[in-house]
From Swiss-Prot:
The gene is MTP6. One of its GO terms (molecular function) is manganese:proton antiporter activity. Residues 145-149, 213-231 are vacuolar. The chain crosses the membrane at residues 124-144, 150-170, 192-212, 232-252. SUPFAM superfamilies: Cation efflux protein cytoplasmic domain-like (SSF160240), Cation efflux protein transmembrane domain-like (SSF161111). Its main location: membrane. Keywords: Ion transport, Membrane, Transmembrane, Transmembrane helix, Transport, Vacuole. GO terms for cellular component: membrane; vacuolar membrane. This is Metal tolerance protein 6. It holds the Pfam family ZT_dimer. The keyword Transport applies. Belongs to the cation diffusion facilitator (CDF) transporter (TC 2.A.4) family. SLC30A subfamily. Disulfide bonds: none annotated.
Length: 376
């Protein structure tokens, strides 16, 4: 039960809590699991159904002011609450893997619901692009007439809105029209590349605005003077821009798009770093690797060991490599079927693009795929 020990030990932080979880989890003598299959019928499977948090730690307390400042003053109860919160999230992830094992798929929206959401999002994107083009033209006129750096900066902001829409459209179009012979694994890497290009353009324009603003502070000339009529036009245009933006916010607030959430919640610097990490092959979190290990171990009773579980970014999704150990006398046909099924399960997870399941009969050999070509 090498994999069982690895998964159960990962649920604790080196405290006694994790050691107490292991015996109950491995015995599998509990009731029926969440997928509708009784754990007693398959005692070789890991089973965490009987584990529940104490009532005193059901909810994590709200974050206090000192937590937002960086946790300079730490309360003794915060660590305990955070620990149980992580345990709860880990158990929820295991339950999700049990559902995938028992049903063969994860519950989600129907095809009709997905099409309805796609149509609504497409309409919102079209309206946003049309509004941005109108606003950009109006801001260009206001910038030429006024010469105000504030209005020019707002004009560049509208230009960036149009550019971001074009980049998103181009990346989506490229992913759908990729040639399977020239690009065997598709063009999913176009998304992080497009975001990096957009971030570079935005940083360049922002830096140029800062330089021009600094230069104008030391310029004593009085070049740009507006008449009353020109001021009225400029103010009306900027008020119209603000009104249209507010209407778009109200209309689009119901769409919980992850890309838009990243743009609004995280800073652009964090977004750039995130996409850089996705291109260089950063490993998945330990909690996610535990979920994958749990899924592979509970796949089939013939699995003797799980030698390796890797998940690393290759674009916006994960590539997964799993090495499982089967009996050395197992027929090839049976071993192939056992190895193919977890690959299909792994690739059905929304975060995973490709999964590779390797079969072996022992786990004492040297690590495979030695880096013999590395020169550093």
């Amino acid at each position: 039960m090498a994999a069982a020990a690895g998964v159960a030990a990962g649920t604790g932080r080196g405290s006694g809590e994790g050691e107490e979880l292991l015996p109950n989890a491995v015995e599998g003598d509990g009731g029926c699991g969440g997928g509708g299959t009784c754990a007693g019928d398959r005692p070789w499977r890991l089973n965490f159904d009987g584990l529940r948090r104490p009532e005193a730690h059901q909810e994590k307390p709200p974050r206090r002011f000192h937590d937002r400042l960086g946790g300079l003053v730490q309360s003794p109860g915060d660590d305990v609450a955070e620990y149980y919160q992580q345990q709860s999230e880990l158990l929820e992830g295991f339950n999700e893997m049990d559902t995938l094992t028992d049903r063969g798929f994860l519950p989600g929206m129907s095809k009709e619901e997905c099409e309805k959401v796609a149509r609504s999002e497409a309409l919102a994107i079209r309206l946003s692009n049309i509004a941005n083009m109108v606003l950009f033209a109006a801001k260009v006129y206001a910038s030429i007439r006024s010469g105000s750096l504030a209005i020019i900066a707002s004009t560049l902001d509208s230009l960036l809105d149009l550019l971001s829409g074009f980049i998103l459209w181009f990346t989506a179009f490229s992913k759908k029209t990729s040639n399977p012979y020239r690009y065997p694994i598709g063009k999913r890497r176009m998304q992080p590349l497009g975001i990096l290009v957009f971030a570079s353009v935005m940083a360049t324009l922002g830096l140029q605005i800062i330089l021009e603003s600094t230069r104008s502070l030391f310029y004593d000339g009085d070049t740009f003077r507006l008449t009353k009529e020109q001021e009225k036009w400029v103010v009306d245009i900027m008020l119209s821009v603000t009104s249209v933006k507010l209407l778009l916010v109200v209309y689009c607030r119901s769409f919980t798009n992850e890309i838009l959430a990243i743009y609004t919640i995280r800073t652009w610097s964090m977004t750039v770093l995130e996409n850089v990490h996705s291109l260089v092959g950063q490993s998945a979190s330990p909690e996610y690797l535990q979920k994958l290990t749990y899924l592979c171990w509970n796949h089939h009773k013939a699995v003797r060991h799980i030698d390796t579980v890797r998940a690393y970014t290759f674009g916006s999704h994960y590539f997964v490599e799993v090495d499982i150990v089967l009996p050395c006398d197992m027929p090839l046909q049976e071993a192939h079927d056992i190895g193919e099924a977890p690959q299909e399960k792994l690739e059905s997870l929304p975060e995973i693009e490709r999964a590779f399941v390797h079969l072996d009969y022992e786990f004492t050999h040297q690590p495979e795929h030695a880096r013999s070509h590395d020169t550093l």
